[in-house]
């Protein structure tokens, strides 16, 4: 390389770094795990002609840093990541774009145009359809927890209202965590009102499920992924974000309880009396799991063509969990781990059939296994302590069991995917080098 670079070469290099950072920003803000962000950025860098040995990428939750250096010249650029959400379609399309750009010799203008198209693409579902999906997802939870179909309907209505309230709060610029608390408050208040309708044989179940659309399943599983992949700093930030979301949800529920004097109807006692043993057939639980999985798929903006796939995944996860838990007697923790791991193992192969990232299929499929009854037992027990012997033990037991189930769900999703990535990484790298060599032969590859 010459010792000096012309202004035109510097401008071209900075444009490449800008495109690289904008790609990474879209991935981070769409809730991609850090390993996927780095892999995609390295692939895009290869397309841009930025050698991996000269490229340095640092990913954090709120900032991306890219540096390219050859010993004589060094250029760095920063990109803030602020508008975090969940957009599985964007994650999938960026992965495809990174390969397509190499195979089809995209110009920088073509790549930028495609990137902008992905960024500005309308979501697959309009807001009210997403809210309906969120409502039915929580209704599915209610049915999985043992509620009847009337309780399913009440839960769906309450969750729909809470979801729309949260969306409106976000539109008005209200703090993210405060929006969650307000949504949980509204959902719980409406569920409380449904107690007095007298139309359901399981009137307390809507209180268990009406706010579960807030469950931070994607941040939780990304946290486990990042920690296992040794992205400790990002993983810790995701964990803190997850805890804050759960605390905000709990805060809203607690306020609702105090405002409506829920303790006067002894709801905490009712929750402790709810059975953890399924009373319905596997068919009913399969239907409820499919509804819940598809509802969360809409929240995560998964392509319509994959809804049935995720529904099947939810059925497999829940039925496997119930079989291992109740038929084999291994308990809910091992049952949840096996349910999520079976889905993740199937997804390792299914990603090649449907051409989407692993998490697009696995995360919505395992969400229906969230232990809502145990979570609410722990929450209600904690805030209604009166110094009676055994209260602390019950709260800690329920809390630890719920936490272990959630952790095992996340591990069951993450571990098979991580091991599979390591096995196929060499094949992907070899394929990438073959495609780059073809570009060189076509005279389209220009290295910095």
Language-model features, listed with the residues they occupy:
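C-terminal transmembrane helix-loop-helix hairpin of multi-pass membrane proteins
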Residues: 206-210, 222-226, 230-247, 282, ...
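Core alpha-helical transmembrane segments of integral membrane proteins
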Residues: 123-222, 299-300, 304-309
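Hydrophobic core segments of alpha-helical transmembrane domains in multi-pass membrane transport
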Residues: 134-143, 159-164, 185-193, 249-257, ...
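Structural signature of hydrophobic alpha-helical transmembrane segments
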Residues: 142-158, 203-216, 270-289, 329-341, ...
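Short juxtamembrane and helix-loop transition motifs at transmembrane-helix boundaries
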Residues: 109-122, 135-147, 163-174, 263-277, ...
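Hydrophobic alpha-helical transmembrane segments in multi-pass integral membrane proteins
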Residues: 190-200, 250-264, 321-333, 374-390
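Soluble N-terminal domains of membrane-associated systems
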Residues: 1-113, 117
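Hydrophobic alpha-helical transmembrane segments
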Residues: 128-132, 152-157, 178-182, 239, ...
